[in-house]
Structures are given as structure tokens and as C-alpha cells.
């Protein structure tokens, strides 16, 4: 019976293992850390590295300084990537929309930093066969998506948000693009932030204006590329001239010119887009 103590030890060890397994099976799964809908980490980075110009009508980015803060940026990107699709789906619409806008902007900065300072435009990151917005390299909601997916298949998807103001919130790292806001978009202030982004952009005469000599509106190419988004009836507006009418005071100076814009019966021309990097060198 010399091996009896050994057998007893094995039986006790086996029993302990079964008890531990049973406890593990009944213990609730560890909860995912609560997501910070204030996006405080992203705001901290933006406040350090974004230079607002002309009251926020435009902005430049200190990409060189951003590169020195790469660890903080990656920590924020990791927090975005850790959100499961089921969790995202359970959020409110403002929470989802703010998340996607911030994700687009933050991953765009990360994309620029992969080659900075050896580029003059985000387009330098593409090729003859594929634009820089097409590769599916962004880990988001449990899969790999492209920047185009975030913008066109999530934010612009019909029935999801149907809000043309998104075009004044996402930033493509280019001078022609609406300003990268110097703070994160947050759910509880999202409406006000989107309204302000639209006002800032429409106030920038270098990109949107009424040309009195030619008697026409001259606006950003964004309105040409995404004109359909301004015909969806958001806030009762179903055309680009009707949208521009809201900003008559920003687009024109003389009262008669403003009345023409408000009448929403003006011709529209689209300005060339400046794809140079929005770099504060």
C-alpha cells in the first residue's frame, strides 16, 4: 500500500480542480472597461497638436509633435479598436456617430504618421491602383475596415444618420478639407459641435463664397462629390442652394447679394480642391 498516499493526493488534487472549474463556470465574465464617451484622450492630443486658424474656419496639424506623442495616440486607437460590435450597436445614435467621426479622424492622423515627414499629401500614401482610403487596415468593431468604410458604409449609410454635417466633421488631412476640430466630438454636445463645424466651414471665403461679379455661388468640391447628401431633407433642406441659404450672411456681404443666396435660385460652381497636407511645419 506504499502508493496509497500518492493515490489520495491525486484524488484530492483532481477534486480541487473540479471545484475550481465549477466556480470558474459560474463566475460572471469580467466586464469590458467602460468606454470613455468623452474621448478625453483624443481631446488632449488635439488641443496639443491642432492649430486653429481664422476662428476655426481652417486648421493645421503639428504632425511632427503628434509623432512624438505616438504612444498616446496608439493607446487611444487601441481603446477604439477594443469596442465590440454588439456594444457599439447598443449605444445611442449620438454616441455611435461621435465614435465613428473620432475614429476616422484619429486613424487618419495615424495613417499620415506612417510616412511623415516624407509626404506632401495624403494621396502620396496611395498608388496607381488604390487610393489611401481603400485598404482595410483599421481594426474596428471586431473586423478590419478602411477609412472609406467608416465614412461611406457607416457614417453615410442611408438610414444610419442621414446627416450631411458629417462632411464638416471628418478630416482627410488636406488643406481643402473642413478643419480638424481642436477637440473630440462628444455625444452630449454633438449637435452643437456639428452646427459649429458647418458654420465655420461656410464662413471660409477661400472655400465657399458668393461671387458678385459672376452672380453665382462658388463652393467646395465637397458639395459636388456628396451633393446627394444635401438633398436628403435633413432639417427640411432638400437642395444645395437651400442649404447655402442658411449661410447667406457668411457667403456674401452686400444685402442684395445675401437676398439672392437666401432665394436659393443662384447658379452654383465648384472650386478646385487643395489636397496638400494640412501640416503646420
Predicted feature residues:
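Surface-exposed, glycine/proline- and aromatic-rich loop segments on solvent-exposed faces
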Residues: 101
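Short, intrinsically disordered low-complexity segments
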Residues: 6-7, 26, 59
Amino acid at each position: 500500500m506504499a502508493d496509497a498516499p500518492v493515490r489520495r493526493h491525486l484524488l484530492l488534487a483532481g477534486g480541487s480542480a473540479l471545484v475550481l472549474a465549477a466556480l470558474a463556470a459560474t463566475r460572471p465574465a469580467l466586464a469590458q472597461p467602460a468606454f470613455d464617451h468623452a474621448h478625453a484622450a483624443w481631446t488632449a492630443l488635439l488641443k496639443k497638436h491642432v492649430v486653429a486658424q481664422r476662428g476655426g474656419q481652417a486648421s493645421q496639424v503639428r504632425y511632427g509633435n503628434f509623432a512624438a506623442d505616438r504612444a498616446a495616440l496608439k493607446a487611444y486607437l487601441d481603446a477604439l479598436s477594443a469596442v465590440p460590435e454588439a456594444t457599439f450597436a447598443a449605444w445611442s445614435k449620438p454616441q455611435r456617430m461621435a465614435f465613428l467621426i473620432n475614429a476616422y479622424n484619429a486613424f487618419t492622423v495615424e495613417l499620415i504618421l506612417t510616412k511623415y515627414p516624407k509626404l506632401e499629401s495624403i494621396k502620396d500614401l496611395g498608388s496607381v491602383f488604390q487610393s489611401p482610403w481603400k485598404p482595410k487596415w483599421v481594426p474596428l468593431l471586431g473586423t478590419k475596415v478602411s477609412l472609406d468604410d467608416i465614412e461611406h458604409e457607416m457614417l453615410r449609410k442611408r438610414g444610419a444618420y442621414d446627416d450631411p454635417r458629417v462632411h464638416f466633421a471628418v478630416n482627410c488631412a488636406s488643406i481643402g478639407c473642413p478643419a480638424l476640430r481642436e477637440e473630440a466630438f462628444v455625444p452630449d454636445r454633438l449637435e452643437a459641435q456639428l452646427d459649429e463645424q458647418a458654420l465655420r466651414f461656410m464662413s471660409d471665403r477661400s472655400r465657399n463664397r458668393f461671387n458678385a461679379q459672376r452672380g453665382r455661388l462658388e463652393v467646395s468640391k465637397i458639395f459636388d462629390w456628396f451633393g446627394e447628401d444635401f438633398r436628403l431633407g435633413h432639417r427640411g433642406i432638400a437642395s444645395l442652394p437651400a442649404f447655402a441659404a442658411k449661410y447667406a450672411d457668411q457667403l456674401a456681404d452686400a444685402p442684395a447679394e445675401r437676398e439672392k443666396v437666401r432665394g436659393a435660385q443662384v447658379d452654383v460652381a465648384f472650386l478646385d480642391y487643395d489636397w496638400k497636407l494640412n501640416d503646420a511645419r
